[in-house]
């Protein structure tokens, strides 16, 4: 199989999601290691959506790795609704999958997920999420004492939030003409109440505001309380209109996340209100048309490029299913943690570099993916943490 670009992932992958994903579960067999009777390893993927901008890329790259490694996967969309996050774990385990990767919403959902995997001897890892020891000590302790919870791959969300505030408040001569001046009245659109990742990003936004205000006592910036848009474009549009109707002096909007659809709605609503290129918009999760949005002022800056995060979660589960010693969970040890780096862009020029090395061509060739699957945890962690535009340039020179 040749190397596949992100642009061609979707056509290549033949994705299975939602009801179709559940229908294919009967093909799973064998627990806690290689498939029974010599069958393939089967790994379940529980994700909020396999069709929005980030969700699609996430499932596509797992599918690419699975095909290279001869693994069967089944994808279930759960919409970040708590009962829909936990129920598919039971279904995947009952069908006999060897491992599961999950993007949950709240830490509390991991209690049922871990217990179910413990009972069924199925390996479990998170992606885009990490159980908080501080906020969820009981859930953290449960994971710590599990022999099947492998760990988590996630991002430095506090640092992400701080960096986006730094970009929003700074002047930028390379930005679209109408939004070159730093923002001071920033509105915050969140997605799901209680989402663990949002809570960390919010800490970063608030920290970034505090740092700016401490350094600029005569030029203060403000950040609104969050208003929640869930994961739909229509609710994103409604929240954006609500912000502007309430305070038309706003000069920036952070769409904190939600997979991409809320951002699509917010950007579209600003266009409908003739505010494109007049209000800075920042977000996390790259849109398919980000280059055009940067060029026209629809977007000011964005963090993203982290769609390889679920790839590494998948590789950890795969390694555990294969019996690789450095990935095997041990009771009393919380598990493995990989902290994935973000890519930040705030100009067309910056995005063009990202596009060349992450979009037009995949950041990993087939041979490189095969090599990643042979690494021990420390080496795999190093590979993940070093992923950047410069890293891909070096490897693919």
Regions found by a protein language model. Name each.
Residues 85, 145, 150-183, 236-237, ...:
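Hydrophobic alpha-helical segments within soluble ligand-binding/sensing domains
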Residues 39, 184, 189-193, 313-397:
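Hinge/cleft segment of the Venus flytrap/periplasmic-binding protein
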Residues 41-61, 65, 74-86, 103-107, ...:
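Extracytoplasmic "Venus flytrap"
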Residues 100-119, 205, 225-292:
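Hydrophobic alpha-helical
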Residues 28-36:
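Bacterial lipoprotein signal-peptidase II cleavage site
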Residues 114-159, 179, 290-291:
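Flexible loop/hinge segments that line or gate small-molecule binding clefts
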């Amino acid at each position: 199989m040749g190397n596949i670009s992100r642009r061609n992932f979707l056509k290549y992958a033949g994705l299975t999601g939602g009801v179709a994903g559940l229908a294919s579960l009967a093909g799973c067999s064998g627990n806690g290691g290689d498939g029974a009777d010599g069958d393939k390893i089967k790994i379940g993927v529980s994700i909020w959506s396999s069709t929005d901008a980030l969700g699609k890329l996430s499932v596509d790259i797992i599918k690419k790795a699975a095909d290279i490694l001869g693994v069967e996967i089944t994808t279930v969309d759960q919409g970040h609704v708590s009962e829909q996050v936990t129920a598919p774990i039971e279904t995947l385990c009952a069908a006999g999958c060897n491992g599961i990767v999950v993007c949950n919403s709240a830490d509390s959902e991991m209690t049922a997920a871990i217990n179910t995997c413990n009972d069924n001897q199925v390996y479990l890892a998170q992606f885009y999420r990490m159980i908080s020891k501080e906020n969820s000590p009981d859930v953290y302790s449960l994971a710590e004492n599990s022999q099947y919870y492998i760990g988590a791959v996630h991002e430095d969300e506090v640092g992400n939030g701080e960096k986006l505030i730094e970009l929003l408040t700074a002047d930028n001569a390379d930005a679209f003409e109408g939004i070159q001046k730093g923002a001071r009245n920033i509105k915050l659109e969140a997605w799901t109440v209680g989402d663990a990742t949002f809570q960390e990003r919010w800490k970063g936004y608030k920290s970034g505001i505090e740092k700016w205000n401490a350094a600029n006592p005569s030029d203060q910036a403000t950040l609104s309380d969050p208003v929640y848009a869930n994961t739909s474009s229509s609710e994103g549009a409604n929240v954006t209109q609500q912000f502007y109707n309430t305070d038309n002096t706003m000069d920036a909007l952070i769409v904190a996340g939600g997979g991409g659809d809320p951002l699509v709605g917010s950007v579209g609503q600003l266009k409908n209100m003739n505010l494109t290129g007049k209000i800075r918009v920042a977000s996390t999760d790259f849109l398919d048309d980000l280059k055009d949005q940067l060029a026209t002022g629809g977007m000011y800056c964005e963090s993203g490029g982290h769609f390889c995060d679920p790839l590494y979660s998948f590789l950890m589960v795969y390694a555990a299913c294969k019996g690789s010693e450095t990935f095997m969970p041990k009771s009393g040890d919380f598990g493995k943690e990989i902290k994935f780096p973000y890519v930040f862009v705030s100009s067309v020029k910056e995005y063009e570099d990202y596009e060349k090395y992450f979009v037009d061509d995949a950041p990993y060739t087939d041979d490189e993916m095969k090599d990643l699957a042979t690494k021990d945890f420390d080496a795999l962690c190093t590979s993940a943490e070093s992923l950047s535009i410069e890293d891909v340039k070096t490897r693919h020179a």
